[in-house]
Amino acid sequence: MPFSPDIIVTGEDTPRILLIVDAKLSSPSHPEYESQLKSYMLHMRCPTGLFVTPDAIVVYRDTYTAHSEKSVERVGLFPAPKTWTVFKVPHHGSELPSARDTHLEARFEETVKSWLEQVRNSPTDYLKEFPKETRDALTDYVVPALSQGVIRGSGPREWLESR
């Protein structure tokens, strides 16, 4: 299945993608996932990417130093907001999510989108709970994209089709 982010931030008056966000209930088990995210960022000329789970936020940035995935660097892995722990689910080794997990993943995606909107509207209030290193990374890479753009779901979701 080709990579597609869950949330995108585009310029207000342009289709340019400023930030992609992939929100999952757990880290993907296949190692090529990071490569797919980097490739998507590279091909869409997206400067910033996030992979978020209830446990962590991983920040990526494109340095535009090469025309390969090597130009997309992992800035760091940071703790997620404490309120996201309600979305933790046990992973039973199956790649196929249950109906309950699919519904929970949809709710998590909406929670992440809402959090991004809150950070955009009041970064100081919503970033103060994080350690300094996390605040700095989000302030340097994520807040500028949020302040310049519009936060959107990236398209139809599998969980919508199952309703």
Residue ranges and their predicted role:
Residues 52-54:
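Catalytic nucleophile loop
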Residues 1-48, 58-163:
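A short, conserved, highly charged catalytic patch centered on acidic carboxylates
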